[in-house]
């Protein structure tokens, strides 16, 4: 055993032992309770960042703790390897996305292995491998058979210069990110999955999940079950009587309608624009906007009057129709009723275009003004109808019922439940993704690829250049034979949304070599007992994976309907930011390692200079580590300098897993210093610790009893904290243990060995390398087996018992000392001991006790 703790040597030795023993290869075992814990699989972007380190360490700690407690634990890993970033990198570097992706996987896998993670690498998957995405294609075809997958036209962002479809994030201020061209909206045929068919189940099943309430609420809002009224405004056009249909949750405000707004793609807009150039121009302008709901929410609200009116269904009054850029054809009916008096967006629109605003809702104690929007205008909880004729005086629910009844009686509409959730469009006009298994035949139309011909393999040697989908130019991929008639045909060149890849990978981990999509092993491991990932995945990934799981269940592939029982959303890793701003307002960000910070006498930062030139930089505050702010910390540099265990210890100690973690160089140094102390104690007491002397607990001296009492008391709390995933306080407990052991005077070697062994096991899940080596070197492995499967220490309840207890001694309510009495001392004995104590004689001024108050187990107060 070396005197000095050398992390590189210790970690290499431990990892060598684990590799030799194939320590993390896991099989099904019906004799043990199982625990399946999964970290969301990473995108192979090139290098791990500190967010990865934190996520995987949390998973690893959980795995090791539960394995020591007798669970059959599994921690797999894979790669979410398809996607647009690989295409962008390929264009920038002139290499196929496949090469860039596989090179990154190799490097990042090496980084994970250097962290000592308990990953069963025999289960590794990469979503870009044909043996994985074959099953994306297979299930897609099953969904097609069942009517869950279907084809319809959808709106996309089209770059007219690059002649390609753009993702929403590639549209910047209405222009293509590469070409700078004004983006157009286009309708193209796309495949969709009927996630709306599962809307009720997706909503209701949230109740049974051990997920953060915040995530559940986000999903509830995204699914968006709404109770309202669907009705129409009648109009006549081209000799036909029609209805302009809208849906509203605020039918109580129907008497406040002063206009209707329709989407640019609405059939009525197209018809009204036929002979009106100004309408056509506005419709074309709307088509240049983004297609994402978020884009619409933030863009400037614009509209143009059509000069056409519909009739109010209850009053018969004319209602002017406008085309609005904020109305989406893909949501609701593509038309909305404008109630500017009680909808904030409509209020702003009406003020902008000088449209009438009517108050039809009142709230007790409030005064309505047209000057500015007030929150209560839209509050249905306090709403009472006014200026609404027969509905005056009705509250929200009563008014909705009454209005709905009248609309139904008039043949205009009725109550309806609607959903914000829309079917999942899975077609992507991109190269690096799962090919959609469809063949286009001139005679037979769209023909599914036969099951025996799966997978449709994506060519890995293409290099995108930004001018359209490379698959459409690849003759080898594109040209094929129709499986129905044998005629020449073309393959579908769209690929699947990469959220498909990540919707079921956790099930494939359980049976990675199966010749079917999943097998019986999947029902052993799934659902996941714990899923770990960032809050940014709360909606799309987590919702899609829930849907995909339910489809697999309904197809008879699995027996469960939810992918994860419990979810932990770990907090972001934050760091300081520093920048300079040029005359044009452009900021250049500097890495904290390249900056020297000065502090005031209270340790607060007051200034900073760049090391390269000694000139000032601006303190930008603490923000999430990111490339854009250049405030990331390279985990590899940290591991190279301090070792993986220090990196792990700091990330677990600095904050509870679900909270944000602020990076601290001093904190990292403190973590390293603590591990050196753990090693140093083991080295300095190696002979005593290695001796396997037994002891009789009943005959131990006071020093031994006190040490054991402290260690087992702290162990009890540490065990509780492990179970509730509060790993920061687990580390605090280990620090208390080391202080107690290191400071124990007169403790015997046998008790030191026992208590140090407890410390090593408590620390092991967090810092497995150093504890594993100390355990082996000091002979614990010979007695209990390797630390990997050593039993979790049991609390010795007898050691916690105390013959004496200490009570606070007060005189006239002021603390004057402490009083030691037998644990089972009577009240009379406690009172006698109190008045006989030196403190009473000193602070009573010779006066006798008038009254003695005893609070059992806590204090004695003598009143004189």
Curated annotation (Swiss-Prot):
Catalytic activity as recorded in UniProt: tRNA(Leu) + L-leucine + ATP = L-leucyl-tRNA(Leu) + AMP + diphosphate
'KMSKS' region (motif): residue ranges: 624-628
Catalytic class of the enzyme: ligase
Residues making up the signal peptide according to the UniProt record: none
Molecular function GO labels: aminoacyl-tRNA deacylase activity; ATP binding; leucine-tRNA ligase activity
'HIGH' region (motif): residue ranges: 42-52
The entry's keywords: Aminoacyl-tRNA synthetase, ATP-binding, Cytoplasm, Ligase, Nucleotide-binding, Protein biosynthesis
Origin superkingdom: Bacteria
Gene Ontology CC terms: cytosol
The enzyme's E.C. designation: 6.1.1.4
Compartment list: Cytoplasm
Residues annotated to bind ATP: 627
GO BP, sorted A to Z: leucyl-tRNA aminoacylation
Disulfide cysteine pairs (residue numbers): none
Record family assignment: Belongs to the class-I aminoacyl-tRNA synthetase family.
Protein's UniProt name: Leucine--tRNA ligase
Species of provenance: Burkholderia orbicola (strain MC0-3)
Designated gene of the protein: leuS
């Amino acid at each position: 055993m070396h005197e000095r703790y050398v992390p590189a040597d210790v970690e290499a030795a431990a990892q060598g032992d684990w590799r030799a023993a194939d320590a993390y290869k896991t099989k099904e075992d019906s004799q043990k309770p199982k625990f399946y814990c999964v970290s969301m699989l990473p995108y192979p972007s090139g290098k791990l960042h500190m967010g990865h380190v934190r996520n995987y360490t949390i998973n690893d700690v959980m795995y090791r703790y539960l394995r020591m407690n007798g669970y059959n634990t599994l921690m797999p890993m894979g790669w979410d390897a398809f996607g647009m970033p690989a295409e962008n990198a390929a264009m920038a570097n002139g290499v196929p996305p496949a090469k860039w992706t596989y090179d990154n996987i190799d490097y990042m896998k090496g980084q994970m292995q250097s962290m000592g993670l308990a990953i069963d690498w025999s289960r590794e998957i990469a979503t870009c491998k044909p043996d994985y995405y074959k099953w994306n294609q297979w299930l897609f075809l099953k969904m097609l058979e069942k009517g869950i997958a279907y084809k319809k036209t959808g709106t996309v962002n089209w770059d007219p210069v690059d002649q390609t479809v753009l993702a929403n994030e590639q549209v910047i201020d209405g222009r293509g990110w590469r070409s700078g061209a004004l983006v157009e909206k286009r309708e193209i045929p796309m495949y969709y999955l009927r996630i709306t068919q599962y809307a009720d189940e997706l909503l209701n099943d949230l109740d049974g999940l051990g997920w953060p309430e915040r995530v559940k609420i986000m999903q509830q809002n995204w699914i968006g079950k709404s109770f309202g009224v669907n009705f129409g405004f009648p109009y006549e056009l081209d000799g036909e009587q029609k209805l302009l249909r809208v849906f509203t949750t605020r039918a109580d405000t129907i008497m406040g309608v002063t206009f209707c707004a329709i989407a640019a793609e609405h059939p009525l807009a197209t018809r009204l624009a036929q002979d009106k150039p100004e309408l056509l121009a506005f419709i074309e302008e709307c088509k240049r906007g983004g297609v994402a709901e978020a884009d619409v929410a933030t863009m400037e609200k614009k509209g143009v009057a059509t000069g056409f009116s519909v009739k109010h269904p209850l009053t018969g009054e004319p209602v002017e129709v406008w085309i609005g850029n904020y109305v989406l054809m893909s949501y609701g009916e593509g038309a909305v009723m404008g109630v500017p008096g009680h909808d904030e967006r409509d209020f702003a629109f009406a003020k902008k275009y000088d449209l009438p605003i009517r108050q039809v809702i009142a709230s007790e104690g409030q005064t309505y003004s047209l000057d500015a929007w007030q929150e209560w205008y839209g509050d249905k909880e306090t709403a009472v109808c006014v200026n609404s004729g027969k509905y005056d005086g009705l509250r929200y629910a009563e008014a909705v019922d009454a209005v709905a009844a009248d609309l139904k009686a008039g043949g205009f509409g009725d109550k309806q439940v609607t959903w914000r959730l829309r079917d999942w469009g899975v077609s992507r006009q991109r190269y690096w993704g799962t090919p959609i298994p469809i063949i286009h035949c001139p005679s037979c139309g769209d023909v599914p690829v036969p099951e025996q011909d799966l997978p449709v393999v994506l060519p890995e040697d293409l290099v995108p250049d930004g001018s359209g989908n490379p698959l459409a130019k690849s003759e080898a991929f594109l040209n094929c034979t129709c499986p129905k008639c044998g005629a020449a045909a073309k393959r579908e060149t769209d690929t699947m949304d990469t959220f498909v890849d990540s919707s079921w990978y956790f099930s494939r981990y359980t049976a990675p070599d199966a010749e079917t999509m999943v097998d019986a092993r999947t029902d052993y491991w799934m659902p996941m007992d714990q899923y770990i990932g960032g809050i940014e995945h709360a909606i799309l990934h987590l919702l899609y994976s829930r849907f995909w799981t339910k489809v697999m269940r309904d197809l008879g592939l699995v027996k469960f309907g939810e992918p994860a029982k419990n979810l932990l959303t770990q907090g972001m890793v934050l760091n300081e930011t520093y920048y300079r701003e040029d005359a044009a307002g452009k900021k250049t960000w500097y890495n904290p390692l390249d900056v020297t910070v000065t502090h005031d006498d209270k340790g607060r930062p007051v200034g900073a200079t760049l090391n390269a030139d000694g000139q000032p930089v601006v303190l930008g505050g603490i923000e999430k580590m990111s490339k854009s702010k250049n405030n990331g910390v390279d985990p590899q540099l940290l591991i190279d300098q301090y070792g993986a265990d220090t990196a792990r210890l700091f990330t677990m100690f600095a904050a509870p897993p679900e909270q944000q973690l602020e990076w601290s160089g001093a904190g990292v140094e403190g973590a390293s210093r603590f591990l050196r102390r753990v090693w140093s104690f083991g080295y300095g007491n190696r002979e005593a610790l290695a001796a396997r002397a037994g002891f009789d607990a009943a005959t131990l001296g006071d020093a031994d009893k006190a040490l054991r009492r402290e260690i087992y008391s702290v162990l009890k709390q540490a065990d509780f904290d492990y179970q509730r995933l509060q790993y920061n306080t687990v580390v605090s407990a280990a620090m208390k243990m080391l202080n107690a052991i290191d400071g124990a005077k007169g403790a015997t070697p046998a008790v030191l060995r026992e208590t140090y062994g407890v410390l090593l096991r408590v620390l092991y899940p967090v810092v497995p390398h150093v504890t594993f080596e100390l355990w082996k070197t000091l002979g614990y492995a010979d007695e209990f087996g390797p630390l990997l499967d050593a039993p979790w220490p049991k609390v010795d309840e007898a050691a916690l018992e105390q013959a004496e207890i200490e009570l606070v001694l007060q005189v006239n309510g002021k603390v004057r000392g402490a009083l030691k009495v037998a644990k089972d001392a009577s009240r009379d004995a406690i009172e006698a001991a109190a008045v006989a104590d030196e403190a009473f004689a000193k602070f009573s001024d010779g006066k006798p006790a008038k009254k003695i108050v005893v609070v059992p187990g806590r204090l004695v107060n003598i009143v004189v």
